[in-house]
Structure formats: structure tokens, C-alpha cells
């Protein structure tokens, strides 16, 4: 068979109950919305025999997953993985109708519990319907860093290892205080978590309402459950390099396998730093077109 993309939808409960009150009957409430996902299968995939390795690639705030397209399927890393026998999955992490009802930019799932639930649902859908290995790799870029990290920390699916490019890891410093996209992620945070507003109509940050979805403050992250590696440029003006460095440093201090590949320049695109590799390991073409794989030559 040739490389193919299977597009699907999964129902996601978007109601966020009060975790601090286990007797609250509202924990039984449901707000079910359909979220979009896709699974890209390699040419080597078969319905029987050896299961294919799945990689969950969490998209950034510059893109989405829709009924007929996604940011991730056009990325070099996805095409390289699929060309070399891996399956790649992603979901939008923010149901389209839910976002429309609350006026949230569809690109900003901000790694919320809704996003985590969607990834978990999509994982089980793919495992149940395709011949895939149950343990997965998780990758993400930018906002996909926080959605991927919160998925890993949920412990809800078996993860082999976690990687990310310039990951968002701190909801306060990187979304609330330094919001990109003209504040769209900050607005999404206010709507999704139900943050209160001050007398000027500005959202008031409240860590207690985030359901543990701020990796920088999540104690589970200090003893990271799987090996993790991040890539980031020191001069990244969208996501704080210092936050990433501290996050990785804390894990290493506690004996975890954590690595940060740092580059002195490159801004918010560490995957584009360096020269094109002429003869990369493995298959380097996707559907007849060469994949642009870079090799960074500078580090700090």
C-alpha cells in the first residue's frame, strides 16, 4: 500500500469540573464536542503482522487539524518519520464547535485538559482500529510542547520518550505575561479555565484553576516519567529559553534523563538551524520529493 492519511473525529468532554471538590456532583456533567484528528500511515503498514510504531506529533499555535488538512502532515519531521516506517497522529485538541461558541481562536488548545482528553481519545481510537504498537513516542513544537508535556504527565497512555522543539512550558510567563498571536492564547486560557476579570476587564491569573496543566508548576514534571529532549534557540523571543533550561535542569537534578540541545541563534525555529544534510540516515524522500533535513553546526 502507499502512504495514506486517515482522518477521523472523536467525542471529547469539554466540561472542566472542580478537581479540588471530589463530592461535587458537577463532576458528572458532560459537554461533548467532536474534535478532528488524523493518522498518517507509512507505505510499510500492514493490517496484520508486525505493528507499526506510532508517534504523536502535537502541532503548534500556527496551525490546526481540520477535516481535510493539518499543520503537522506538511512538516519535514513528519514526512521523514512516515517515509521511514512510522505512523504519525495529531488532533486539534480544541473542538471546532466549542471554540466557536466561546469565541476562542481554533489554533490555541494551550495544552488544556480538553487537549489532553482529545489526545487520549484519539490514541485509543487509533490503537483500536489500526495495527499499531501500544507504546508511543510524543513530539511537539511550540504550543505543541505544552500539549505534549501535559499528555505525558497525565500518565494515561504508555509513552516511550518525549521530544519537542521550543516548547511552551510555563502558562504564566509564556502565555499569560508574554502572549503571542496578539494575545489569542491568553484569551483562550481565560475562556477555557474560566478565569475571573478585574475592574478593567483583564483576566486575573489563577494557578488553582489550571487543573495541573502548567508543567512549570507541576510536581510530576520534576521526576519526569520518560526520557525527554528539547531543542531551542537562545534568542527565541516567543518562548523563554530560560524556562526550558530550568525545566530540564530540575529533571536532571532529580536523576531523570533530560536533555536540552541549545543553539545561539535561530529564533523560534530550531529545526531550521544549520545546513541541509546531503545524505541523511534512512529514506530522505517523501512521495518523490526530497525532505529538507538540517544539521545544526553551532551549539552553546
Regions found by a protein language model. Give the residues of each.
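N-terminal cap/lid segment of alpha/beta-hydrolase-fold proteins
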Residues: 1-49
Amino acid at each position: 500500500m502507499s502512504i495514506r492519511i486517515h482522518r477521523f473525529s472523536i467525542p471529547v468532554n469539554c466540561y472542566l469540573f472542580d478537581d479540588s471538590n471530589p463530592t461535587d456532583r458537577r463532576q458528572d456533567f458532560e459537554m461533548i464536542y467532536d474534535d478532528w484528528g488524523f493518522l498518517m500511515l507509512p507505505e510499510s503498514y500492514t493490517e496484520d503482522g508486525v505493528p507499526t510504531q506510532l508517534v504523536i506529533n502535537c502541532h503548534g499555535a500556527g496551525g490546526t487539524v481540520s477535516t481535510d488538512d493539518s499543520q503537522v502532515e506538511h512538516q519535514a519531521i513528519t514526512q521523514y518519520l512516515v517515509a521511514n516506517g512510522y505512523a504519525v497522529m495529531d488532533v486539534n485538541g480544541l473542538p471546532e464547535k466549542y471554540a466557536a461558541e466561546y469565541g476562542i481562536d481554533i489554533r490555541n488548545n494551550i495544552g488544556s485538559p480538553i487537549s489532553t482528553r482529545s489526545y487520549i481519545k484519539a490514541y485509543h481510537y487509533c490503537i483500536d482500529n489500526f495495527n499499531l504498537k501500544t507504546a508511543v513516542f510524543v513530539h511537539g513544537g511550540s504550543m505543541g510542547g505544552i500539549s505534549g508535556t501535559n499528555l505525558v504527565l497525565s500518565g494515561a497512555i504508555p509513552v516511550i520518550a518525549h521530544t519537542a522543539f521550543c516548547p511552551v512550558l510555563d502558562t504564566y510567563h509564556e502565555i499569560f505575561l508574554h502572549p503571542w498571536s496578539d494575545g489569542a492564547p491568553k484569551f483562550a486560557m481565560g475562556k477555557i479555565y474560566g478565569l475571573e476579570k478585574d475592574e478593567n476587564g483583564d483576566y486575573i491569573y489563577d494557578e488553582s484553576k489550571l487543573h495541573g496543566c502548567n508543567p512549570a508548576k507541576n510536581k510530576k514534571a520534576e521526576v519526569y516519567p520518560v526520557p525527554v529532549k528539547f531543542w531551542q534557540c537562545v534568542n527565541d523571543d516567543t518562548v523563554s529559553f530560560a524556562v526550558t533550561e530550568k525545566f530540564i535542569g530540575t529533571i536532571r537534578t532529580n536523576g531523570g534523563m533530560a536533555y536540552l540541545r541549545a543553539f545561539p541563534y535561530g529564533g523560534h525555529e530550531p529545526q531550521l538551524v544549520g545546513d541541509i544534510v546531503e545524505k541523511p540516515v534512512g529514506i530522505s524522500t517523501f512521495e518523490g520529493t526530497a525532505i529538507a533535513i538540517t544539521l545544526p553546526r553551532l551549539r552553546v
